[in-house]
């Protein structure tokens, strides 16, 4: 399976989710809105929470400040962008990037319903972020980077758009070192699209962060997502 094939499988999987919803993920406890507290979810449109497909809550670990610019990679229905926009306030800015027009349409409607005016949703690939160099203070993401066929350009782009001193605070699925693939990702695109086959091993993840020039990398497991795989907080900083 080529990188293009993987992208198409992921695109088809999440396009269908945009059409049918993802509320059942929250019942699992490992995914989606279940990773957020009820008070937080009560303050956002239900359509944003119902389409949450992440593996954590970036806002539990990132200390956003008023006036900051934050970027959410793979912003989906807009939940984390809406929360970010409120935390950075009217002097700040929250961007979301997604490669699906269907998700962008939903996210923009959710932001409008939430009364958020300092958020912008952009069409693009996380391997080619449509923002200027050194334009962002914080990059967040929620169970999206594992979907990329090649993580190296993703983190190179993250480093490019971060300002000096900017920080990374993302949730992703990370595989334990030594774990064999559960399935052959070259023939089963669904295992990639549902956050299985694309997970980097722990040590490989740290190497990719370092190769991008990011410093103080750390990975903290939060919960199991499958055999040998974990939802994890990934942190780093641009020097």
List PLM regions with ranges.
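Short, glycine-/aromatic-enriched active-site segment of Class I SAM-dependent methyltransferases
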Residues: 174-196
């Amino acid at each position: 399976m080529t990188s293009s094939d993987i992208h198409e499988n992921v695109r088809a999987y999440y396009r269908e989710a945009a059409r049918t919803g993802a509320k059942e993920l929250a019942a699992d406890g490992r995914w989606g809105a279940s990773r957020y507290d009820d008070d937080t979810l009560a303050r956002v449109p239900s359509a944003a929470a119902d389409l949450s497909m992440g593996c954590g809550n970036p806002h539990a670990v990132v200390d956003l400040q008023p006036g900051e610019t934050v970027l959410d990679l793979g912003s989906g229905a807009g939940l984390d962008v809406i929360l970010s926009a409120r935390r950075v306030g009217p002097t700040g800015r929250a961007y979301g990037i997604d490669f699906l027009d269907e998700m962008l349409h939903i996210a923009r409607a959710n932001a409008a319903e939430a009364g958020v005016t300092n958020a912008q949703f952009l069409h693009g690939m996380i391997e080619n972020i449509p923002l200027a160099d050194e334009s962002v203070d914080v990059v967040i993401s929620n169970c999206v980077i594992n979907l990329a066929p090649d993580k190296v350009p993703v983190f190179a782009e993250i480093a490019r758009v971060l300002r000096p001193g900017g920080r990374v605070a993302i949730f992703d699925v990370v595989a334990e070192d030594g774990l064999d693939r559960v399935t052959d990702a070259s023939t089963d695109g669904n295992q990639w699209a549902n956050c299985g086959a694309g997970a980097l091993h722990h040590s490989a993840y740290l190497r990719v962060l370092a190769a991008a020039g990011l410093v103080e990398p750390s990975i903290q497991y939060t919960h199991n997502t499958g055999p040998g795989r974990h939802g994890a907080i990934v942190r780093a900083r641009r020097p």
